[in-house]
């Protein structure tokens, strides 16, 4: 049976509307999700893999040093007065090297190489890196703190060794150029032949102290970041590629072939989260993302804070902090001693970096108030000192990230070393870093073209198809049944009767209903 032309048009229009419903609300989300699963996996064919291997633009690496303006008084036990100097801005280039794929368990192994280049134009006005800063002698205090913790009976010998290695220093401070302590290095004189300095330097060489480089003639060169600069990190990291299950992408499963650490207790030794450079897609506000920091030997679990936007893309902001190890059951296993945890907001890094330092938020943000009261000159501000990451939730792409950490040291108080007998024993700040990522315009546009433009086009198209398809179907149906509709409109419940003249020969007035009209009665006045 052939359909009338109007019904054919109506059927076609209705089909368009139905297709718009099915494709726009059912098929397209499935197709988009499937495509994202392929694109976000660390397979060799994806753009994500290329960017994961080598970030094609520099990250911002900013360092803020704390200058001690009252060093002589601090040596006598006074509260330090600090002046923040910075930022010293470095362009940080990151890449992964010695990459190997393992098809059988869907993993990939790699090592890291970071390169830092000082950028005076982006640093604070007037800073060249040649400024002299006064800070606690990191190496000297580190030696004393390590021996005090591990072999306290040898503190007297370490005191004698310090006099030889550091030429009988007048106090526990160093006056040093900013770039020297950060990257270029300061000389540690281990050429002395006296027993105490020689024995101490031999132990240093054997232990492989972090930040220490052996120079000719039994000299050492020490810096905070110099050993990281343009060198391959020895640790081999294994992560999931996410090809079999995209929700596993980037998950750290082993470091140096070991599936867990041995430096903490219980669950804190587990590798939880991604390597911090890639995250799974389809994030919601209720999801707790996780990333593992090999530099701090721990996982962080940022939580959702609020809706944000970046270059026209809607994002979700997540924030994090160091935490409170004594009160948070998940973090209690980071306490080296179960019965004695660091104060709130402080993390003992000694088990991780083999140096007696503490990590905190900059300016002791979200920390025990006592830490802030131990010094003058700090002003914690969550906007300037907090950890925050803005994610595009559908793809899981970090659009903007600010990872901020402060490094602190204890002013060891001990009677066994003259230089240390009058110190306060408080934990004080040395410097803090702000490592920032912000996707440039090129990669934002790439994300828009791959994800948002198709999504918006389909969003408009599906409504157009449903609206105009429904309208076209209605018009076709109405047009086809127009004659029938008109007949129904005319007939309805109304009856039409034919009027014929009566056969009565008496003429009647058609305007009169009822009996024939009679002459009205006359009234006498």
UniProtKB/Swiss-Prot annotation:
Residues 1-11, 478-525 are cytoplasmic. Disulfide bonds join 268-333, 297-352, 335-341. Keywords: Cell membrane, Disulfide bond, Glycoprotein, Membrane, Olfaction, Receptor, Sensory transduction, Transmembrane, Transmembrane helix. Residues 497-525 are annotated as: Disordered. It comes from the Eukaryota. The chain crosses the membrane at residues 12-32, 457-477. GO terms for biological process: sensory perception of smell. Glycans are attached at residues 67, 229, 324, 440. Residues 33-456 are extracellular. Belongs to the CD36 family. Plays an olfactory role that is not restricted to pheromone sensitivity. This is Sensory neuron membrane protein 1. It comes from Mamestra brassicae.
């Amino acid at each position: 049976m052939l359909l009338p032309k109007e019904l054919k048009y109506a059927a076609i229009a209705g089909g368009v509307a139905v297709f718009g419903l099915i494709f726009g609300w059912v098929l397209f989300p499935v197709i988009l999700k499937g495509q994202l699963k392929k694109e976000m996996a660390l397979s060799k064919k994806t753009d994500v893999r290329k960017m994961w291997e080598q970030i094609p633009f520099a990250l911002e690496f900013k360092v803020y040093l704390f200058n001690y303006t009252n060093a002589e008084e601090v040596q006598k036990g006074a509260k330090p007065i600090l002046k923040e100097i910075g930022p010293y801005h470095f362009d940080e280039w990151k890449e992964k090297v010695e990459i190997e794929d393992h098809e059988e368990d869907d993993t990939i192994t790699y090592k890291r190489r970071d390169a830092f280049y000082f950028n005076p134009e982006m640093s604070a006005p007037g800073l060249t890196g040649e400024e002299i800063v006064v800070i606690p002698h990191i190496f000297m205090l580190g030696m004393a703190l390590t021996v005090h913790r591990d072999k306290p009976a040898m503190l007297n010998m370490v005191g004698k060794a310090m006099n030889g290695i550091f030429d009988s220093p007048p106090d526990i401070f160093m006056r040093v150029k900013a770039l020297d302590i950060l990257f270029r290095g300061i000389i540690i004189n281990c050429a002395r032949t006296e027993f105490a300095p020689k024995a101490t330097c031999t132990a240093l060489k054997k232990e492989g102290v972090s930040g220490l480089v052996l120079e000719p003639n039994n000299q050492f060169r020490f810096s905070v970041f110099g050993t990281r600069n343009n060198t391959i990190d020895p640790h081999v990291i294994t992560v999931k590629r996410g090809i079999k299950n995209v929700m596993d992408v980037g998950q750290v499963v082993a470091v140096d072939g070991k599936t867990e650490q041995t430096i903490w207790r219980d669950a804190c030794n587990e590798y939880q989260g991604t390597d911090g450079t890639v995250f799974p897609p389809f994030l919601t506000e209720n999801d707790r993302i996780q990333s593992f920091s090999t530099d701090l030997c721990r996982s962080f679990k940022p939580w959702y804070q609020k809706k944000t936007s970046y270059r026209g893309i809607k994002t979700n902001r997540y924030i994090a902090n160091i935490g409170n190890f004594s009160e948070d059951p998940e973090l209690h296993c980071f306490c080296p001693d179960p019965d004695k945890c660091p104060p709130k907001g402080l993390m003992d890094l000694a088990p991780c970096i083999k140096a007696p330092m503490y990590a905190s938020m900059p300016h002791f943000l979200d920390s025990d108030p006592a830490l802030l009261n131990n010094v003058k000159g700090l002003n914690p501000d969550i906007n300037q000192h907090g950890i925050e990451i803005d994610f595009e939730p559908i793809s899981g792409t970090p659009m903007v990230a600010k990872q901020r950490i402060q490094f602190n040291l204890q002013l060891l108080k001990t009677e066994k070393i003259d230089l240390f007998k009058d110190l306060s024993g408080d934990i004080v700040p040395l410097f803090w870093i702000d490592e920032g990522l912000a996707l440039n315009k090129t990669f934002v546009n790439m994300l828009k073209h791959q994800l948002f433009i198709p999504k918006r086009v389909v969003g408009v198209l599906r409504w157009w198809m449903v609206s105009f398809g429904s309208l076209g179907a209605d018009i076709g149906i109405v047009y086809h049944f127009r004659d029938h509709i008109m007949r129904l409109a005319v007939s309805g419940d109304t009856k039409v009767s034919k009027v014929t003249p009566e056969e009565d020969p008496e003429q009647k007035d058609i305007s009169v209903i009822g009996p024939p009209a009679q002459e009205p009665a006359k009234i006498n006045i």
